[in-house]
Amino acid sequence: MSRIPALRRQPGPPHSLEKMTDLVAVWDVALSDGVHKIEFEHGTTSGKRVVYVDGKEEIRKEWMFKLVGKETFCVGAAKTKATINIDAVSGFAYEYTLEIDGKSLKKYMENRSKTTNTWVLHLDGEDLRVVLEKDTMDVWCNGKKMETAGEFVDDGTETHFSIGSHDCYIKAVSSGKRKEGIIHTLIVDNREIPETS
């Protein structure tokens, strides 16, 4: 009788083939410090639950006999609270939903579009993502909170900062219309950058 050698698992990156067999959901979440990828593994036969944020394992639970429930963790530099809800749909089918700060991902992103402005630009051979948080006037560039200086000008305000050797500012002016409110414009080296929708 011939013997078949046992297969040994080779050490590898966190995204190994073994991981992909139980991968059930992937979400991209845009926060001020960048776009974060959240991946969720749910082994319905093994009871395994694993949450990855940007490829890094945040939660691992084995032998969870209760297949429905929730997993809560933090995302990004601001440690934003995120929860994955696991609900039974029918039989052995499951639905996975992501909540950010207690809101559905869709509702959270709709709300964020009202409270932030985002610009994507290419500068010195690098792709940059600039985010303005309207409530605090904090400015982020590729995940780093920028040092800023505010200045009042005739028609509004300017929030000045630098990206490398480039002078930048975000100009805030009234739209003159109550529903539109304040219009924010990013200027880099005296050139207006279109906002990302």
Task: Label each residue range with its predicted role.
Residues S2-S197:
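Cysteine-centric segments in proteins
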